[in-house]
């Protein structure tokens, strides 16, 4: 172990000078880095900003020509494929170089968000120190300078310059040098996505591609020349480094050109020495034998670095791109592509082999989860060792960073030295062995079972199989039933279709038969109607001839000259034959028209139902034909004979359209034919009504809307006038009977009548009845005379039975008694006359009938049994009664109607008094009963209400 191994140092600025101090582990510097731009401030602190673990891997010489041997180290991670690439680190001798690297780190961190291809780059730091060696500014090599470069585009560089200029002055070429350094360093980190076996020519070409932007068209030569100048300037002003600002080393331009030229010459000399050293290192690397077969990859990497150094050297020459170099570049590119393809194939094969083994271990771990598989654990570590060649680390700090990245991304393993890999894998194996030594009482999934459990499993399996069989049997049974039901349903549907087809055919046949029968009936009807018309014509002709002959004979008997009539008779017979033929033809035509009209009416009714519109022309044709036929028939009949006979025939034809008298004369043989003829005539009359209606209403009615042309007439007005009158009188009489029954059943009626005179009672009663009959009086066209009586009378005559015999008899003295119809007429006429005379409506009281043959008329001059009053209405009624005549003297002899005929007045008064007392007693008894029943009814109502 060398001095300084394992120490973590940290730089600190004290009084403007940089000093190294020991820093504890897990310590992070709190020095905030402030940029010149106020808008862009570095927010993410660096993890290994200033602390570095120093590890010396080779003894160094203090001489100015001797340099430290550089060893590669791999500490990069890949997010996508898990591929690793080696990054070269070179050791420096100066502490001031660490400050330069820190500045590069800060610039790199600032630029990394702006370059998306560089997001996962690693911060590379040159950290090797020589123990107890003082810093030498003159021994800064080109490798040391260019290992900390960053590749930037011109736009990014201009943006950084503008941000710095906002806080400071314009940047000098030193800042450009810094940017170029950071650019180159980031480029080395950005090649991590490429395989490790690519040669240095590919790197050189990609360096050209990155550095030569199409917009700028800068060459690699200018980049490296500019870089060398910047490094010299930085070294020159390094003693004047100020801690206040990290850009303080970048901001000032060297004014002394002579010193710059001297520095440039010294720089070229050091580059030549570096080229010679690289050649020696290449020879040494070829002789190495790596036990993990890393010699090939190491060789490739050393070749890359050698060619890179050579390219850097040739960049400084005057002719960097000669034809020979281009040929070499082409060959190297071809070789590099071939190596890349071989490496890719080898990786694919390794992945396939590893995936097979991993699958087997995974399944074994699944079934025997308690067993430990150390091979599978170690395989995860061997994956990282066998995948890619790896390099020695400069310090464990970079290894720690790689381990952290491997923890974050499990698919990528960190590349460490073989000794360290064994050191990491060993404790894991120990943990696995310790876990396997523990006693496990749990039975794994593939462990053996006892016979009881095996039998139980077999029994369960058998049950499950039986259950599945039962389920399948049920499913099959359901499917079979469903299939049978489907077949049955289809069969029923087919039978139903056949049945419907048969019914349809039968209906069609029946319809055709009905049509044939209808046609036959129509033909028979037309034949019979023709025969009927012919017989009617012959009968008419015969009747006319007979009448003419009878008239001639009568005139001859009276002595008149009948020669002209006989002559006319002969002419008339010829004309009658001609007219008969015309009439027969017209009748035949009318039959045809009637047949057409029947079919037309049927069609129109059907069309009316379906709402199909017909033409006006058809109706006009038929109505014209019908009117023409009717006029032709009338004209023929009028021209048959003489004017007298023709007038008689016209009267017969007009009044008796159905020819029933002629059929009665002919006999019963023509009754059926007359009925058929009547049907035909009714059809013609119907058509005539339609034509009249069309004439009245020329506008056709709306379709499917039955608008009645006549006003609504109630059924009661359709009766004859006499019947209407009788119905109204019956209605009034019924109302009067109901009114008397109500008054008769009223208990206070008789008691009220005692103190009221019969005239007042009579007048009030007449007023109530006159209101009921007033509508009948209005309907009378003329008032009937009181003395006009009907000749027909019923044998029974009414006798007034008065409810209150003491009062009602005097009220009804002036009313005549007759049969029902005559009584109603007299009542109406009496009420009309009293209305005309006095203006006060009065009507007779209801009088029931008694079995007697006489009609009694009371004497108006007879004294009244009650107190007399001077009622003008009663006097008017007496005047009306005086005008009446007595038909029979027996009416005066009646003691009930005529009080003058009463011989024993005392007896009559005693009878009336007894009746009044009896009535009063009955009324008193009724009141007592009502008063006794009222509390009982109230108690019952209360009990009934309380029950609810």
Swiss-Prot record:
Single annotated GO MF: microtubule binding
Cellular compartments annotated: Cytoplasm, Cytoskeleton, Microtubule organizing center, Centrosome; Cytoplasm, Cytoskeleton, Microtubule organizing center, Centrosome, Centriolar satellite; Cell projection, Cilium; Cytoplasm, Cytoskeleton, Cilium basal body
Pfam hit, one: CCDC66
InterPro entries from the UniProt entry: CCD66 (IPR039183), CCDC66_dom (IPR040467)
Coiled coil: 467-558
Keywords, sorted A to Z: Cell cycle, Cell division, Cell projection, Cilium, Cilium biogenesis/degradation, Coiled coil, Cytoplasm, Cytoskeleton, Disulfide bond, Microtubule, Phosphoprotein
Domain of life of the native organism: Eukaryota
Any single GO CC term annotated in Swiss-Prot or TrEMBL for this entry: photoreceptor outer segment
Function: Microtubule-binding protein required for ciliogenesis. May function in ciliogenesis by mediating the transport of proteins like BBS4 to the cilium, but also through the organization of the centriolar satellites. Required for the assembly of signaling-competent cilia with proper structure and length. Mediates this function in part by regulating transition zone assembly and basal body recruitment of the IFT-B complex. Cooperates with the ciliopathy proteins CSPP1 and CEP104 during cilium length regulation. Plays two important roles during cell division.
Record note on quaternary structure: Homodimer; disulfide-linked. Interacts with CEP290. Interacts with PCM1. Interacts with ARMC9, TOGARAM1, CSPP1 and CEP104. Interacts with CDK5RAP2, CEP152, CEP192, TBG1 and PRC1.
Protein's name in the database: Coiled-coil domain-containing protein 66
The encoding gene: CCDC66
